[in-house]
Amino acid sequence: MSGRTVPHAHPATAEYEFANPSRLGEQRFGEGLLPEEILTPTLYHGYYVRPRAARAGEGGRAGASELRLSEGKFQAFLDVSHFTPDEVTVRTVDNLLEVSARHPQRLDRHGFVSREFCRTYVLPADVDPWRVRAALSHDGILNLEAPRGGRHLDTEVNEVYISLLPAPPDPEEEEEVARVEP
């Protein structure tokens, strides 16, 4: 018995899977629930939450996001299959990479739905925001990529000088000065 160990990831350890996730799944916003998802409760054992059943035809990828950092490049994959290419916007603001998408109300298999999301990634310090490239695959996976190892971008800090204003004159002192001056 002493030779067996039970794997356990405590939140205070580096192995804790949810402390810094590289994948974000189960983001099927605005879609209906299947009957088995309503009747089957979510299992909770310690730090494990069972994901909802994968829908037929979607392969469990809808709405998923994956982030990869390697020696040579920064990569992010985001499922935007519910949106047309014209409805997706990618931009960088300082060291932030922002992906947003929005579509107006349209008919789907459950009724009418409109969707909107915004996801922001923090770029590593050695990634130039001007070199980020985006490509959309035929199945709706957005590939965001930028080379690493370039120049280290310094954060611009503007320190504002604080000038000291003179104290306002005391009204009592002004009266004394006025009395002294005949």
Curated annotation (Swiss-Prot):
Nucleus in keyword set: yes
SUPFAM superfamilies: HSP20-like chaperones
Start and end residues of each sHSP domain: 55-163
Gene3D superfamilies: 2.60.40.790
Subcellular location, record wording: Cytoplasm; Nucleus
Protein keywords: Cytoplasm, Nucleus, Stress response
Pfam families to which the protein is assigned, alphabetical: Crystallin, HSP20
Predominant place of localization: cytoplasm
GO MF annotations in UniProt: structural constituent of eye lens; unfolded protein binding
A Gene Ontology term for the protein's cellular component: cytoplasm
Record has Cell membrane as a keyword: no
Signal sequence extent: none
PANTHER family: HEAT SHOCK PROTEIN BETA-2, HEAT SHOCK PROTEIN HSP-12.2-RELATED
Subunit details: Interacts with DMPK; may enhance its kinase activity.
Function: May regulate the kinase DMPK.
Protein name: Heat shock protein beta-2
Naturally occurring in which organism (per UniProt): Rattus norvegicus (Rat)
